[in-house]
Amino acid sequence: MPGPRPRKGPKTSGQGAETAKQLGLFVEFNPEDMLLGVDETEDDGDLEAELLALTGETASRSRKPAPKGQAPLPMAHIEKLAADCMRDVEEDEEEEGLEDDADLLTELQEVLGEDEEAGLLDGSEAASPDLCEEKTWDNTELPVEQAACQQAVPAAAQAGGPRGLQALLEERIRNYREAAASAKEAGEAAKARRCERGLKTLQSQLATVRKGGKICEDEIPPPVALGKRPPAPQERAIKNPEIDSPGPCAMEPGNLSQPESSLPAIAPLPDSDPDPQALLLARQREYKAAALDAKRAGDLDRARELMRIGKRFGTVLEALEKGQPVDLSGMPPAPADLKALPQASKASSATQGLSPAVEQMQPVMASDLPATPVAPAEPTTVLDALQQRLNKYREAGIQARANGDERKARMHDRIAKQYQDAVRAHQAGQKVDFAELPVPPGFPPIPGLEPRKGSEQDSVAATLATAQKLASEDAALVDDDEESDTPAQAPLAKKPAQTLVSPSHLLTEPKASSSKESLSPSVREQVTLLEARKLQYQRAALQAKRRQDLEQAKSHLRVAKSLEAQIIQARAGQPIDLSKVPSPLTDEEGDFILIHHEDLRLSQKAEEVYAQLQKMLQEQQAKCLLFSKQYMHQGNVAETTRFERLAEDRKKQLEILQLAQAQGLDPPSHHFELKTFQTVRIFSELNSTEMHLIIVRGMNLPAPPGVTPDDLDAFVRFEFHYPNSDQAQKSKTAVVKNTNSPEFEQVFKLNINRNHRGFRRVIQSKGIKFEIFHKGSFFRSDKLVGTAHLKLERLEKECEIREIMEVLDGRKPTGGKLEVKVRLREPLSSQDVQTVTENWLVLEPRGL
């Protein structure tokens, strides 16, 4: 048997900690020392030896001896570090020799030339505000000019890149530009965007080649097919016989300020000439350079006028970039060919002499025809007559804009757009309703139409009526994009808005329009209402299209088309069901965007006043629309129009209030007026064959024996004895638990026949019976709480009955109440006319 194991001696203190440290436990470490190597930064022999080897110095006697066991850094590593240091020095020396690089010097000279030209106009900013304005415009158009200049720079002037590659890129750029223009004219937006992306790639590659860089030829976009472009109108352009390419864009910066004075007279370009964009850019730069020379010579008036003329080239260039044909027959001549302008005393007359030349250079959408004379000649064809009237309205719009009457100018521009659509439709072989086109005063009728008696007076009256209508609609139309400095802007290609009729109806259309005057007043009111509603939906479709909401735009256009059919039906004397006319649109989002500035903060009281006023205006607008809808279903056109105008007025007042709040103004002064309205109540959402029963709530219902009021689980059952007692319509509500005042709010649809004799008998004698029950448990049946009875005689003159009935136990009142409603579309025997008195909010106009 083994003996007892010998006892171990007691462990000395601290021996367990040493064992833990040997195992890696409780090791103290400093993260900063691990990252920075603090222990190795001082008194490290290896690092000192490496430093001495790099610097070539000898070790100091006072230094500590390097620890044994660590070898110095190998010499091969040291030589590699030294070679790297020497290599950096050589690269710096190579960069110092870049000043002899011809490519970089050429690029630097181009940049400095543009900066010098821009800096020459800075000296006279204080003396001439107009020149400062023109300088700002010049800087904004600089990228366009640089792009055109880069396109026109000859290959001999480029220091880097092969000429063949550069010529290929330039030819490919012209190909993509023509393809993009052709796609835009054909209405192919996707193809136009693809061509524009390829054009940007080609332009960046051309810029790289011109700077001497290299590009991968495989990345050059391939040529695109131009396709069959639509027959464009004949264009008249200008040409300098001595200039075969847009050379003025390739002028050196030093010669920019010296315009060429040897330019010959302007001659029309043949069909084989290049794109007129380069000619326009060249002429624009000539005018800028001439303005710079005039400014240096001290002739600020001439410089200002030349800059104004140069500005107007931008409008034509924009139209040209959009793919629209441009008439260059009226382009101003070279600045050297213009006579010197007089001093400031005659500056205004010189402006009038130079401006028409530029105003004639505008985009055109039809064939080039002579200007309309003061006394128009007798047209031979329909196209001639349309073009004469189009030119007349264009001239009227330009003249109105020159006089500062933007409202009248926009009106003439819209009429001109109608004629442009008619010209396109006629050229495409479509049929146009010429009777709807306004006729300028004194113009002969369109060939093929029989002149009516007193045609001159009728045309003048029709023109005045159309002008007045367009002027009144100007404030509501959202066409701010048309308010530009362009005398006449070519519209986008779209379908003509005129009604298409057959040629046989052209001669009978005046008779049909004259028969409109013989319509009865009620029918005339219906036609006016339908036309206004159609115009409203067309405007809404246009706004939805501008917001890129194509589905909403299509929906509004379908409604407008259906209204057009109803208008034709009304003019033909057929009856119209106004209850089926679409309701007026409500703009929940508003017609404008409010910009709230951070520095404009209203007081808390002002914010509350604005909120209350806006709430009241919104409620009044909703009431007006509701009343208008009710009268529309009754067929009362006059009252419908009246309430629609009131709703429009409330909407305008709300917009004015929101705009004033956004500008940080104080709330406007306002007062209230008592207005009394005679309204006809109708529930248009109901059909004539249904009646709605609404069980709203129970109040303080009695509990059956053995049930406390808080444990009442109530539900309501009803019976409507129609069409007969055996086939009575029955239903019940859901169970509301644990309350004696349940809220049901349930709607039941009951089928009825308003003209049935049995329905009238039920309405007058029986009514609807209600029974309130307490829901039983699994082994207990439902317990009756009480009954109620609703009489329906008031439905003869009212379309809604609201009753709070007493709950009875047999014939004994229980103290409980039951609230119910019954609704019909309209009363059975008469109209539900109600008199409503409103406190009408009126905002007082602000003083100037």
From Swiss-Prot:
Comp. bias regions, Acidic residues: 476-485
UniProt subcellular location: Nucleus
GO process terms (BP): negative regulation of transcription by RNA polymerase II
SUPFAM superfamilies linked: C2 domain (Calcium/lipid-binding domain, CaLB)
Coiled coil: 165-193, 600-626
Principal localisation: nucleus
InterPro entries assigned to the protein according to its UniProt record, in alphabetical order: C2_dom (IPR000008), C2_domain_sf (IPR035892), C2_Freud (IPR037772), CC2D1A/B (IPR039725), CC2D1A/B_DM14 (IPR006608)
PTM sites of type Phosphothreonine: T586
Record field: compositional bias (Low complexity): 487-498, 509-522
Pro residues compositional bias, start-end: 438-448
A single MF term (Gene Ontology): RNA polymerase II cis-regulatory region sequence-specific DNA binding
C2 domain location: 666-805
Modification sites for Phosphoserine: S455, S583
Swiss-Prot/TrEMBL keywords: Coiled coil, Nucleus, Phosphoprotein, Transcription, Transcription regulation
The protein's assembly and partners: Interacts with CHMP4B.
Function according to Swiss-Prot or TrEMBL: Transcription factor that binds specifically to the DRE (dual repressor element) and represses HTR1A gene transcription in neuronal cells.
The protein's name: Coiled-coil and C2 domain-containing protein 1B
